[in-house]
Amino acid sequence: MPLICADITIPANTPQTSPVRVQVKVPAGVIRKVWVLIPYGHKALAHLVIRHGETQIIPWYGDIHGDGEQLVFDEVYELPTDDVLTLEGWNEDTVYDNRFIVRLLVLPKPYAYPEIYSLQALRKVLEVMGIE
């Protein structure tokens, strides 16, 4: 069950029109949880979004910003094959670079959807027993 760890450092005066982008390789599976650590000192001046291709997946709209907090997103986002996510950030701070730390929990489908796979296994057992 891969825990993907990544971070992005955004230089001071990085405009939204020309953001910093960091690509993160992720295995096929289901993204079930995302943690974003915003260190103290950001003063809500640095901003982050996570994209899959052109689609923004975290957050669904707006952007992540804050100061000295950890955000946790319970997610269900399927990646049918090994793929790449993009951390995209900009920084309105005129003096300091700012960094976001990101963790992604990617589960194989049987672990992400245990109820579905349990029912399928039960159906197979009943079928073998001649019970439908």
Predicted regions and their residues:
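Beta-strand-centric surfaces of beta-sandwich/beta-rich domains
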Residues: 1-29, 35-132
